[in-house]
Amino acid sequence: MSELKNGTTEPKKNETTQSDSKSKSTSTNKSSVPPASLVPVQPTALTSRDKTTQRLIVVLSQACLETYKMNSGGPGGDRFALLNCDDHQGLLRKMGRDIAEARPDITHQCLLTLLDSPINKAGRLQVYIQTARGVLIEVNPSVRIPRTFKRFSGLMVQLLHKLSIRSENSKEVLLKVIKNPITDHLPTKCRKVTLSFDAELKRVQDYVTTLDENESICVFVGAMARGKDNFADEFVDEKIGLSDYPLSASVACSKFCHGCEDVWGIY
């Protein structure tokens, strides 16, 4: 500090006053908080109780989600694993079962595709899983499915034994087993379709435009490696084709999401 003629002091060039420091700190803190207009608004998640909002509903049918007891007793108690064709080939042969029956990875791929989609983030998507053994599962749109298959397997084992998975923070139910049939959980006005390679080919965008203003659409997608397309015949109104080529379940889910997004203006 240097002394002036009137007895006051003047800060040096490299020194800052305490008030300057406080003002800079305050401005820094303010700038770290985004304006309200920049904070994304999380849409309200759809539930089966909402019977009127137009939406896309995807039912992953014949999903291969089955647990197997690896050992019993011991200090850790019973241990279960999600049956899959990579880790349990010998076991499947011993049981006389086709390896293709144990493909839970297909359900995993479909869930990642669906829950990552813009239509889900916009609050216009509902997802259900119907296992090959007839267990019906409701998927909360806000659930974060594990990216790795190993962690996904552990989550599914926990779900199938506890019947529900809750968020650790808010205690919100993220996954739960619900009562059949699926039609009890669909909107009042809902067109139900399933996909078939032998059905008439339709462009998803064109098909969605034929819906009434408040009519939802429910698509049954086979979440299995191979099999007949009659898994939803008791529920559906019609069958449609999406491509001249065989599609994986994940790609079929993606095409329907994109089609609805285009028609409903979701970007």
Curated annotation (Swiss-Prot):
Q: Where is this site: Stabilizes Arg-103?
A: D105
Give the GO cellular component terms, alphabetically.
Answer: nucleolus; small-subunit processome
A molecular-function term among this protein's GO annotations: rRNA (pseudouridine) methyltransferase activity
User: What's any GO biological process attached to this entry?
Assistant: rRNA base methylation
Name the catalysed reactions. Answer: a pseudouridine in rRNA + S-adenosyl-L-methionine = an N(1)-methylpseudouridine in rRNA + S-adenosyl-L-homocysteine + H(+)
CDD domains cross-referenced by the UniProt entry: Nep1-like
Indicate which residues the UniProt annotation says bind S-adenosyl-L-methionine.
L195, G222, G227, K228, D229, L242, S243, D244, Y245, P246, L247
Question: Which Pfam family is one of this chain's hits?
Answer: EMG1
Keywords assigned by UniProt?
A: Methyltransferase, Nucleus, Ribosome biogenesis, RNA-binding, rRNA processing, rRNA-binding, S-adenosyl-L-methionine, Transferase
User: In chain numbering, where does the site feature Interaction with substrate rRNA fall?
Assistant: R103, R144, R147, R151
The protein's matches in SUPFAM superfamilies, at most eight in alphabetical order, are given as:
alpha/beta knot (SSF75217)
Low complexity: compositionally biased ranges: 16-32
Tree of life domain: Eukaryota
What does the record give as EC number?
2.1.1.-
| UniProt-listed InterPro entries | Alpha/beta_knot_MTases, Rbsml_bgen_MeTrfase_EMG1/NEP1, tRNA_m1G_MTases_N
> Subunit structure, per the record?
Homodimer.
Under PANTHER family, the record lists:
NEP1/MRA1, RIBOSOMAL RNA SMALL SUBUNIT METHYLTRANSFERASE NEP1
Q: Which family does it belong to?
A: Belongs to the class IV-like SAM-binding methyltransferase superfamily. RNA methyltransferase NEP1 family.
The name on file for this protein is Ribosomal RNA small subunit methyltransferase NEP1
Q: Which organism is it from?
A: Candida albicans (Yeast)
